[in-house]
Amino acid sequence: MTILTYPFKNLPTASKWALRFSIRPLSCSSQLRAAPAVQTKTKKTLAKPNIRNVVVVDGVRTPFLLSGTSYKDLMPHDLARAALTGLLHRTSVPKEVVDYIIFGTVIQEVKTSNVAREAALGAGFSDKTPAHTVTMACISANQAMTTGVGLIASGQCDVIVAGGVELMSDVPIRHSRKMRKLMLDLNKAKSMGQRLSLISKFRFNFLAPELPAVSEFSTSETMGHSADRLAAAFAVSRLEQDEYALRSHSLAKKAQDEGLLSDVVPFKVPGKDTVTKDNGIRPSSLEQMAKLKPAFIKPYGTVTAANSSFLTDGASAMLIMAEEKALAMGYKPKAYLRDFMYVSQDPKDQLLLGPTYATPKVLEKAGLTMNDIDAFEFHEAFSGQILANFKAMDSDWFAENYMGRKTKVGLPPLEKFNNWGGSLSLGHPFGATGCRLVMAAANRLRKEGGQYGLVAACAAGGQGHAMIVEAYPK
């Protein structure tokens, strides 16, 4: 019997799994605050012989907004174009020096399936600049970035723009399969008799719309259900999840008020006011959060709207270059993009444990340990997902039985973890979050005086990603 197929109704919070995944209590608010930054000593650089250094010059994003708000009348390429335009203004990079543009997205608008190309043309890039779009669920922007890293490291390109976009306010809603088939057959009919025969087969239930799938294709389970079962399997309580969500919103509000979210660029929405900041940051109270009912597994689940990331519209873009090219153009890069790793697990049993599996692999590849990391930036799909990953990473038993490791991965110190908020509070436009994570790590390293950042994320399909970001010397 696997972790997540253990019967939910027989798995109380104080289950035998809690004994396996012993961890310091997370239900103490004082432990969920970000501690003041500590200046770190310079460590070794991760430069590798005969491999080009790839640097982040800068990165921007549109404000991340709750779906159905100010961006609801736009198309995805409008948001992507805004991110590209913001990047051009921020960096003053000549459009003609950009060799390639790569964007990530998840739910594609059929009119602009290659949204990277349409956005690039709309932003004024040359029609001679190639662009393509990738999709890898919540790590689509990560894939866009690492594809760019590969093109630069191999010498194919010097200058790449990588980013991502998602517009959840207007997802494609299709006719039913029966209606689509009928319309296609009618289009092929060559006589009135054939058309009348086909029309006679029409039934009113053909008009029922087909909404975008919210469940995993391979398992038929929604991510929220999986998060609820994961939290139960790792004995993560409702209170712990609510406290972590409150931490995320509180830290995001503090960072927003102090002007630390410098990657956000204003966006003048056509026909509306200029949007200048994320609108999903809403610090509440544990008392208010406790009033919410379970969102997925009812009535006993612990995942709610308050401790889950919300549907978000937004776009991001980053300028990445070969180090020698950036310096030749007079830029002062923000960070190096170093080793990265992609992983995959069983989507039924371990859908959201990508960070647990990817973290030790990327650390070993880079020759680092958890103690070397100064800034952790993990994607927060759900509070329960983050806390379950914490418990898995801090468990020798899990490492031995599920990861084939002799010892546990280790627990990220909360005082270094998502100090400016995360996806729970800032929002999660599926295709754009990866760039936000990397820029948060890069900006935190510069602000806090650290050297290494670790970015990690889970994704639909049971996949995950982790990357090492190294601060560029001041």
Swiss-Prot record:
Cellular component GO terms held in the UniProt record: endoplasmic reticulum; mitochondrial envelope; mitochondrial fatty acid beta-oxidation multienzyme complex; mitochondrial inner membrane; mitochondrial nucleoid; mitochondrial outer membrane; mitochondrion; nucleoplasm
CDD domains membership: thiolase
Stored Pfam families: Thiolase_C, Thiolase_N
Residues with PTM N6-acetyllysine: K72, K188, K293, K298, K332, K348, K361
Protein name: Trifunctional enzyme subunit beta, mitochondrial
UniProt disease link: Mitochondrial trifunctional protein deficiency 2: An autosomal recessive metabolic disorder of long-chain fatty acid oxidation, biochemically characterized by loss of all enzyme activities of the mitochondrial trifunctional protein complex. The disease phenotype ranges from a fatal form characterized by early-onset cardiomyopathy, cardiac failure and early death to less severe, late-onset forms with myopathy, recurrent rhabdomyolysis, and sensorimotor axonal neuropathy as key features.
Intramembrane segments of this protein: 173-220
Naturally occurring in which organism (per UniProt): Homo sapiens
